[in-house]
Amino acid sequence: MSHFFADHDAPLSMLSVKTEYFPQLTDKEQKYAHFMSKASHAGSRVVMRQVSHESEPIFDLILAIHSKLNGKYPEDDITQKQQTGLYLEYVSQFLSNLGNFKSFGDTKFIPRCEVKFFKQLLELAKINPCSSPLTLSPVDVNHEFTSHHLFSTINELIDIGIYHVEEKAALLGFPSQGYTSAYYLGLPVTPEDMALLKEQLFAELAILPENTRINKVGENSFQIWVASENVKNQITETYPSGQITLSNAVTKVEFIFGDHSREMRLVASYLKEAQKFAANDTQKAMLQEYINHFVTGSSQAHKEAQKLWVKDISPVIETNIGFIETYREPSGIIGEFESLVAIQNKERTAKFSSLVNNAEEFISLLPWSKDYEKPIFNPPDFTSLEVLTFTGSGIPAGINIPNYDDVRLKIGFKNVSLGNILSAAAKSSSKHPPSFISQEDRPIFEKYQSDSFEVQVGIHELLGHGSGKLLTEFTDGFNFDKENPPLGLDGKPVSTYYKVGETWGSKFGQLAGPFEECRAEVIAMFLLTNKKILDIFGFHDVESQDKVIYAGYLQMARAGLLALEYWNPKTGKWGQPHMQARFSIMKTFMKHSTDKNFLKLEMNSTNDDFAIKLDKSLIKTAGHECVKDYLKHLHVYKCSGDVEQGSKYFIDRSTVTPDLASLRDIVLSKRLPRRQFIQSNSYIDDNNKVTLKEYDETPQGMLQSFLDREL
């Protein structure tokens, strides 16, 4: 039960751009950033509805308590002070994750404070515990599409929505298997349901499912809820009106428009304001497609916006918005709302530009034939950004988008590294020194961890996600020689490929996320030893290069062990794709290297802690060789669409063996709280100038930032 408790003593960081980066912008750029930021935050409730059915009513409750108490919580004695502190820690983590499931780990978390104390706060705030959660919600929300009504009283919301945990229901996954997912409503949705809808509805009608939710109204009857301001279907040329029957002649489906209608209207209205301050015609056209997408629900409009986004090269204010990453929806096809507004860091961007300019040379070093690479590498935009606003359940250190395979193939993609996230994430808290790093390794690890992480993120995003060609059949032919296919891992021509309409996500499903993250991470490990890349990042002498390499391999070994927290021993289920990937890489170091001394663990005398022992003299030989072998398998399986062998291989490599499973309790006992980020709010003052408001790095600062957003 204790592993479900909210983090205690978590570090909080203000994402500050107020003094260094924001003042460098012109008035026009500041206003563009302001309205894009408003559009971004306007989607916050959408994320909560996607995280869990209880997240949005919990949000309304904790903000109502804070407002009615004027931020003054009971602190009359030591017990009250302690309970208040524990309550605020829960609230801060909830707001940081935009829901009551960890964005990194996909498990529910509950307050450490007593239920009795939580209900005392209701009394102090004069909130009737027997009233409906609907009484706390904004009046213009269409509750047909929200979950407030699932809890008859606020007491029930607290008892069941906030505090109740069951081992399986506390994990995200298919409801039919006992897990939780707010992407689905009505009767429990099964993997077979989603496979059917994927193949016979979305693929056949060429409709992208990212901006939908699924309401199962009967055993063979579904409503597809489409996110749009419009509450009626205004795009009947691409989305059928009324109920249709799928090709199995049994299943009935109907598209229902107007999901998140209030939020989609707000997002679109702020985008219209941002249009007035766009830097160029490409940005204006991109914003118009975004507006079309959010108003009508057209998935194709979002794809058009992403094409224009890729063509908007190196903007001073970088933005992206939409239903983007599909990791958290159990079938891997519906996207979480996500939005980024950030300012380019020109000094850091120069490093990444140099990496881009040499990308073809570095890709040619990867261990496969040119048949598995695009014939021409279109150098993508790669910028380092300082985040002003990020709406989503969690903020990554780097992003490589768009995710549409055909756009990536025919037009390209962009890479962004989020500098202020990267710097904060790599910081060790003085209260929490890094676990499992030996005393002798700690000086190198603490000095070079951040530098090594920056290099890894650069390689991961550009050369990891940016490399490879999916062998694909199109309506007008193949993008490879069908009569003489590339050779597979067994030296024989491959027999699998992506048929018309198939994508990486649709073919590999739930495994696509962790598999691709793993491939990108392994490419980072493979190329981290490259002296030219290290030189680009400012490490010119052999000594500093070797320390960056060692810190990088040490960091990956540690991350793979920390990953055990995100693996459920009862279900065998992984809760986080990046951590499943990192575990498999650590396991590769330990169990698939030709020299068993490459990675070992040294237990302490009481068997309640251990230290990582990584032999730095073996990194460039046995270590690099096992990385190369793993990488070649992952890449060929992905590019050839060999879902059977590829899935079997990756599942085997990421399966937790009994000896490693035995370390999980130690990993949990040493678990460090995850850093939380507080974001500023922007305003236009009486002089028509944009001002930024920043907040204290405390739970109260986090709370106030959300209250000021008026969501």
Swiss-Prot record:
Its main location: cytoplasm. Disulfide bonds: none annotated. Its cofactor is Zn(2+). This is Probable dipeptidyl peptidase 3. Present with 3260 molecules/cell in log phase SD medium. Binds 1 zinc ion per subunit. GO terms for biological process: proteolysis. One of its GO terms (cellular component) is nucleus. Keywords: Aminopeptidase, Cytoplasm, Hydrolase, Metal-binding, Metalloprotease, Protease, Zinc. GO terms for molecular function: aminopeptidase activity; dipeptidyl-peptidase activity; metal ion binding; metalloexopeptidase activity. It catalyses: Release of an N-terminal dipeptide from a peptide comprising four or more residues, with broad specificity. Also acts on dipeptidyl 2-naphthylamides. PANTHER family: DIPEPTIDYL PEPTIDASE 3, DIPEPTIDYL PEPTIDASE III-RELATED. Belongs to the peptidase M49 family. It comes from the Eukaryota. Its EC number is 3.4.14.4. Zn(2+) binds at H460, H465, E517. It comes from Saccharomyces cerevisiae (strain ATCC 204508 / S288c) (Baker's yeast). The active site is at E461. It is found in: Cytoplasm. InterPro entries: Dipeptidyl-peptase3, Peptidase_M49.
